[in-house]
């Protein structure tokens, strides 16, 4: 005969096995749970924890959208760099003096975050912001 303490232990082991083994068999039959049923956070929550420059999905999407808009504005040779707008070579069809009135796409594109994409796209045709204390005549 089994001692009472051992009997309690065996019942606990049997209860644990009867609740886990069918779950494991169902898991193998159905595949792993998807979405919120898996107990993991959604991908959007994970990507929201990253900041600019980390390659988060929303930053890649914003960069692609801006590249599309800028290619329509400046032509197919438009690309994003880390250089300031004043360092970029204007398109070949722009005459001297006119490039100062073009939008600063690169300077504003690097500052885009999340829902600001629409604002940045709408501001593309505005004149570049002037530094304080300096005025250029065209």
UniProtKB/Swiss-Prot annotation:
<dbReference type="GO" id="GO:0005576">
    <property type="term" value="C:extracellular region"/>
</dbReference>
<feature type="signal peptide">
    <location>
        <begin position="1"/>
        <end position="35"/>
    </location>
</feature>
<protein>
    <recommendedName>
        <fullName>Putative uncharacterized protein IRX2-DT</fullName>
    </recommendedName>
</protein>
<keyword id="KW-0732">Signal</keyword>
<keyword id="KW-0964">Secreted</keyword>
């Amino acid at each position: 005969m089994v001692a009472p303490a051992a009997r309690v232990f065996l019942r606990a082991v049997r209860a644990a096995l009867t609740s886990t083994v069918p779950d494991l068999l169902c898991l193998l039959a159905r595949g792993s749970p998807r979405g919120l049923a898996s107990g993991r956070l959604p991908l959007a929550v994970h990507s929201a924890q990253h900041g600019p420059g980390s390659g988060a999905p929303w930053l890649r999407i914003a960069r692609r959208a801006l590249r599309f808009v800028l290619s329509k504005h400046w032509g197919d040779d438009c690309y994003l760099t880390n250089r300031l707008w004043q360092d970029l070579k204007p398109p070949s069809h722009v005459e001297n003096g006119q490039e100062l009135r073009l939008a600063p796409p690169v300077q504003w594109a690097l500052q885009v975050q999340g829902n600001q994409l629409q604002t940045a796209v709408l501001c593309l045709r505005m004149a570049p912001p002037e530094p304080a204390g300096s005025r250029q005549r065209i």
